[in-house]
Amino acid sequence: MAVMAPRTLLLLLLGALALTQTWAGSHSMRYFSTSVSRPGRGEPRFIAVGYVDDTQFVRFDSDAASQRMEPRAPWIEQEEPEYWDGETRKVKAHSQTDRVNLGTLRGYYNQSEAGSHTIQKMYGCDVGSDGRFLRGYQQDAYDGKDYIALNEDLRSWTAADMAAEITKRKWEAAHFAEQLRAYLEGECVEWLRRYLENGKETLQRTDAPKTHMTHHAVSDHEAILRCWALSFYPAEITLTWQRDGEDQTQDTELVETRPAGDGTFQKWAAVVVPSGQEQRYTCHVQHESLPKPLTLRWEPSSQPTIPIVGIIAGLVLFGAVIAGAVIAAVRWRRKSSDRKGGSYSQAASSDSAQGSDVSLTACKV
């Protein structure tokens, strides 16, 4: 059986992303993992990726030839071999725990051994513009549905159903929340600070969106105006339509912010307008890189060059990455006031070979 169709993975991951949000000026480190059982084809496939803000920096795929945690950002490549040995060891331990958990959960739900099943996990921490801890989180899903989640107090759990209640009782007896809280408030924050400092030229940059508007007649009476924002970073952006100065959010078709494949992002928002009334509509673009919002209006005489090939290529790449690497199109909100600049102290050098503990959060269900 194939690991999973791109559309299925996209839906599962976007559903998980909707559960999280960051504050203005904050930074985040998040790990995403997926285990998929393959009856009759050997071990489950396990994929894990790590993100700092909107940038993927590490990746592991149990089907890859290297069988190692691999760098995905230039600034993480400077870590010593001991770091990569440690990260590989932890992520492999995580995959083995998930292998056991897949069997356990199949029993909880009285499922046969013939079907393929999926475990997903997201965990991480946020820091403010001063580098101090804001919050931590862990969320687990089974077969695309919520299973169990760490509450905001970092001391208790919310179980989604009766099967998850079994896991909740086990984890409470093992004091797993206390162990996880210590990691999220301590080591997770230290490594996030280190990564922000080492990768500040990339992680704390801003790339202004390249904007334009397109027009497509759908009938003799109506046309679609589409407002494009391309090649921007970070991912948080707002596109809004107005008619004669009045908000048109209810009538706007808006897509999720999507990675372009080159470290930047793209997004569009569209409205259907009566033919001949295009001039009454304006698109407003807000992004951290802009000193003030941009306002776009359709000009009938303009003939914009629409980079359709580039856009499609970016979306195809996005689908391929989702299918092969199980990443998330990270779109946590951050506003412009506090994000620029800032210096983050690194984790103590004595810990440099340990890495962020991606095995701690893998506990048997």
Swiss-Prot record:
Disulfide bonds join 125-188, 227-283. Residues 338-365 are annotated as: Disordered. One of its GO terms (cellular component) is external side of plasma membrane. The keyword Transmembrane applies. Residues 209-295 form the Ig-like C1-type domain. Pfam families: C1-set (PF07654), MHC_I (PF00129), MHC_I_C (PF06623). Heterodimer of an alpha chain and a beta chain (beta-2-microglobulin). Involved in the presentation of foreign antigens to the immune system. This is Class I histocompatibility antigen, Gogo-A*0201 alpha chain.
